[in-house]
Amino acid sequence: VGMEPRRDAESLRGARRSTSRRLPRRAAAGRRSFTSTLKALDDLAASGAKISVRITDLDRGTSVLAGDDFVTLPVAGLGVVPLLIEVAAGFEAGRLDPLEIIDRSRVDPVTVGGVWQHLKAPALPLSDLAVLTAATGDALAANALLARVGLPAVRARIEELGLSRSALLDLFRDERGPDDAPHFALGSARELAEVFAALVNSQVVSPSVSAQVAEWLSFNHDLSLVASATGLDPFSHENDEHGLLFINKTGRDAGIRVEAGVLAGPRAGVSYALIVCFDDLSISHRLRAHDAFRVLGTDLMEYVF
């Protein structure tokens, strides 16, 4: 398992700030405007959607755009990020063996997403499960990792990272009953953006842990929301010929769309997070939510290039 810090990650320097602004009254001063993003988010908010957004300039360490970024909302599959951090920390400390084999039959079946459920391989090593979790949002692989490290350990890691508005509540489930947690995970846009900024600046646990988690996240195949504006190949975008540095993670559930990541080009680098909780009453409601993410992606590309 490669645990060396990435050189391009080290080149992105930024401090974290806790400044917040309510939607939607702040855009990048003196640089690119986020007018289109603000309009798209205003339209969503007017339709009753709950929105939390944060963009931070990595070089300046200042807020570029913030709206209700302190509000805790469901983040669906983006909750695997602290799980991956705990797994990487376990590898580094020797508490976990990356090649330890986990048998699928020992994990309760879940079909909400991912590919392991469709593979013939009945068992995989922890390191491969981490790759599946990051790359394909594999719920079964994530549950296997969570069963191995334990929910208390991930919650302790979240507390250690200072994420007071984030929580991993439960396993992935096909259906949530009255005795189950209502969501897989919770978070705020500010904390999500901070975590991704810290990852590329080698500040999460240690440089090697940060590099490992950033590497896993760089395999993510879901470039359909904010990342759709990058023009990157969903299946091969680790080394972009145009000098674009990009990692992201998305979260999806009924009426929930979330994306957080880092986007850096020759002009600037940003960490970003957008959470939208909406009434998924029709395809038009869903597409309107998706469109807001894509508009943000276009504005971010203009900002970094």
Regions found by a protein language model. Give the residues of each.
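Short, conserved catalytic-motif segment at the N-terminal edge
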Residues: 49-72
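A short glycine/serine-rich beta->alpha loop
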Residues: 66-74, 115, 119, 178-181, ...
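Conserved catalytic neighborhood of penicillin-recognizing serine enzymes
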Residues: 109-143
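Mid-domain, small-residue-enriched loop/turn segments at the edges of structured enzyme/sensor domains
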Residues: 47-51, 146-201
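Active-site SXXK
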Residues: 61, 74-102, 272-274
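Short, glycine/proline-biased beta-turn/loop segments that scaffold the active-site neighborhood
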Residues: 93-119
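Structured C-terminal helix/loop/strand segments within mature extracytoplasmic catalytic/sensor domains
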Residues: 4-45, 64, 71, 199-233, ...
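Short glycine/serine- and small hydrophobic-enriched flexible loop segments
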Residues: 85-93, 147, 194-201, 302
